[in-house]
Design a protein with these regions (language model features):
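Short acidic, glycine/serine/threonine-rich helix-capping segments at coil-helix boundaries
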Residues: 342-347, 355-399
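Catalytic glycan-binding domains that act on GlcNAc-containing polysaccharides
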Residues: 48-277, 293-296, 305-344, 366, ...
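C-terminal segment of classical bacterial N-terminal signal peptides
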Residues: 16-25
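Bacterial N-terminal signal peptides that target proteins for export
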Residues: 1-11
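Intrinsically disordered, low-complexity polar regions and short flexible loop motifs
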Residues: 43
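Intrinsically disordered, low-complexity Ser/Thr/Pro/Gly-rich interaction regions
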Residues: 281-282
């Protein structure tokens, strides 16, 4: 069977199961079994046989471990050095190169069809499941049903539960076989059920989409998903760059976009001093560890990687790992020695202090997000520090001394 005949959006086999979007969210405190019946009703409206839903929900109880994991708040904010350093290791690079060589024919065929370079499929595989060595052992139907009925994200996970039932209805696997992370991500590439349904590919043509044991299906699904969420050749996702002396640090932000050639005209070069591509594609410069750490240019494909996972540090990890799997050099500029995570309480204190200075007006949540970094940048400008939006120990000390 040629690739065009193989299912990508499950078009041929899902016509029976197509249906309307999920209805309104469930009221706080709804009984678990009652909640399951509401989800079943939504699923049957989308074509799932009632017997399939009944079998999937038979004896199902909420998973308290999933509830606990969902409610757990991180004690410390993530930093570039800790996150990327843990995701991009020499061992992971070497294994990625070995697996890319092992599956080269398949990966080259997928690149020709979908436009996604092999090293990116390998990088996602490496970051998501360490090349398939740990795909999670939670029962997916139980996990997503628990999250739908016992947490605040009812709409999202109710839909994921319906999509999991649709997967069962199409005989891709049994409830017991459908295992993944506590949040419902499945298989080598950790697809949510809705992602499986929309972007899954039966590359082998056996009538089933198997993201667990069929690497052709898993890799093709990843390539199809990436193309669907915006990947376009030929530029990579990102590259390390060197900034010229006097570069305006307030321009190093994802909200600032310029054509690649405009950054080149400002004196930005690739790390190692090679010229940037001659391109009019929109791009941004970021400093994930502040002005003393590495700088990167983000090309449009970085947004595609972010559409897979909304974490900038996750996307940086995938981009850096892909570059090194393809034989590129490690990042040349290391992070500063004091690139240490801030505790949640420390971020809350910082947000409160910035709010008293009328620089921060958003929710005090203990998260070092874009709005908090913007407020940090404003105060850095006021006190004469480099305005890179990163709260260094000196910044924190100066802020605590402010009256």
């Amino acid at each position: 069977m040629n690739s065009l005949a193989k299912t990508t959006l499950l078009a041929a086999t899902t016509a029976l199961l197509a249906g309307p979007a999920l209805g309104p969210s469930y009221a706080q405190g709804t009984d678990f079994q009652s909640c399951l019946q509401t989800i079943k009703a939504d699923a049957t409206r989308q074509g799932v046989p009632a017997a399939i839903a009944d079998r999937a929900f038979q004896g199902l109880t909420p998973d308290q471990k999933v509830v606990d994991l969902d409610s757990r708040q991180p004690e410390f904010s993530l930093t570039y050095s800790k996150y990327v350093g843990g995701a991009v290791t020499p061992d992971r690079v070497t294994k990625g190169q070995q697996r890319m060589a092992q599956h080269r024919a398949l990966l080259d065929a997928l690149q020709a069809e979908y436009g996604v370079p092999p090293q990116y499929i390998m990088a996602f595989w490496g970051v998501e499941t360490n090349y398939g060595t740990f795909m999670g052992d939670f029962q997916v139907v139980r996990s997503v049903a628990t999250l739908a009925c016992m947490t605040k994200r009812r709409d999202f996970f109710s839909n994921e539960t319906v999509q999991a039932l649709r997967i069962l209805a199409m005989n891709h696997m049994t409830r017991e076989q459908m295992r993944g992370s506590w949040a419902g991500a499945m298989g080598n590439m950790q697809f949510m059920p809705s992602t499986f349904m929309k972007w899954g590919v039966d590359r082998t043509g056996d009538g089933r989409i198997d993201l667990w044991t069929s690497l052709p299906d898993a890799f093709a699904s990843a390539a199809n998903f990436l193309r669907g969420i915006g990947w376009k050749p030929p530029l990579p996702a990102s590259e390390e760059v060197f900034l010229p002396q006097g570069f305006p640090l307030d321009q190093a932000d994802t909200t600032v976009e310029k054509p690649v050639r405009a950054w080149a005209q400002m004196g930005v070069k690739k790390a190692g001093s090679a010229a940037l591509p001659s391109s009019d594609e929109p791009s941004s410069i970021i400093l994930p560890a502040g002005h003393r750490g590495p700088a990167f240019i983000l090309y449009p494909n970085f947004k595609a990687v972010m559409n897979w996972n909304r974490s900038t540090l996750y996307a940086m990890s995938v981009a850096i790992l892909a570059q090194q799997i393809a034989g590129g050099a490690p990042v040349m500029q290391g992070p500063p020695a004091d690139d240490e995570p801030l505790s949640r309480d420390a971020v809350i204190d910082m947000q409160n202090r910035l709010a008293r200075l009328t620089l921060y007006t958003d929710e005090v949540d203990g998260l070092l997000g874009p709005k908090t970094r913007s407020a940090v940048r404003l105060y850095q400008k006021q006190i004469g520090l480099p305005a890179d939006g990163h709260p260094t120990p000196e910044f924190v000390r100066r802020l605590q001394q402010a009256r």
